[in-house]
């Protein structure tokens, strides 16, 4: 990625569209959508799986032609309530219609067969405290290895109190040397 400072896409519901190719990565993709009430978006996974995180607002989700109902758990990310989301396996069409102003994050990575579409309920996501002092932060584990709803995606939301650090102690994920280091591609 030549330019590390990305700016929102103008005049588009899709504000960011980061692909493995555009970032010169192997796996991770990320899209961010800002929808107004009544707007809709449609997409289809091919070789990738996705987790759609409802950052702010509420919307109806349809997966493979089946209405899965309304998702959303907050009107502002700063409410510090857990988000809700939806797991989309590979080769699956999906659409979302905004019932309110809606911000969506679409996290993606290569997938494998054998996983099913599933709702990620906000009341099943627990708040975890990590670190101490100025290194304290709060984590919502949306999809992690202890809740294997996805093949290769790990998705969290982090809240860092004002004046605190989010990534301490210093660490890296640029090689596989388990259990010392694991290779991960991360977006923040």
Where in this protein do the model-derived segments appear?
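Conserved short histidine dyad/triad with adjacent acidic residue
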Residues: 18, 29-46, 68, 158-181
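Cytosolic regulatory regions built on CNB/CRP/Popeye-like sensor folds
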Residues: 1, 34, 64-65, 102-104
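Conserved hydrophobic/aromatic beta-strand scaffold that supports enzyme active sites
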Residues: 30-34, 51, 85-87, 106, ...
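Glycine- and acidic-residue-biased ligand/ion/polar-headgroup-sensing regions
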Residues: 46-69, 88, 162-163, 175-188
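Surface-exposed beta-loop interaction hotspot
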Residues: 101-162
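Ligand-binding loop in jelly-roll beta-barrel domains
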Residues: 73, 77-115
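Hydrophobic, proline/glycine-rich low-complexity stretches
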Residues: 1-42, 49-60
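Double-stranded beta-helix
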Residues: 79, 137-142, 146-153, 161-188
């Amino acid at each position: 990625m030549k330019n590390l400072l990305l700016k929102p896409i103008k005049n588009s519901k899709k504000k960011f569209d980061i692909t493995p190719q555009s970032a010169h990565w192997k796996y991770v993709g990320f899209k961010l959508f800002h929808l107004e009430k009544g707007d809709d978006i449609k997409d289809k996974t091919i070789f990738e799986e996705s987790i759609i995180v409802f950052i702010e607002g509420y919307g109806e989700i349809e997966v493979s032609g089946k209405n899965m109902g309304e998702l959303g758990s907050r009107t502002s990310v700063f409410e510090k309530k857990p988000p809700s989301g939806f797991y989309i396996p590979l080769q699956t069409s999906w659409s979302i219609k905004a019932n309110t102003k809606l911000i969506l994050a679409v996290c993606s990575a290569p997938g494998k067969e054998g996983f099913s579409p599933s709702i990620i309920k906000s009341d099943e996501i627990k708040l975890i405290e990590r670190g101490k002092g100025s290194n304290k932060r709060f984590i919502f584990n949306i999809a992690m290895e202890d809740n294997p709803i996805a093949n290769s995606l790990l998705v969290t939301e982090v809240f860092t109190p004002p004046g605190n650090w989010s990534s301490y102690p210093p660490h890296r994920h640029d090689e596989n040397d388990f259990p010392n280091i694991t290779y991960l591609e991360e977006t923040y």
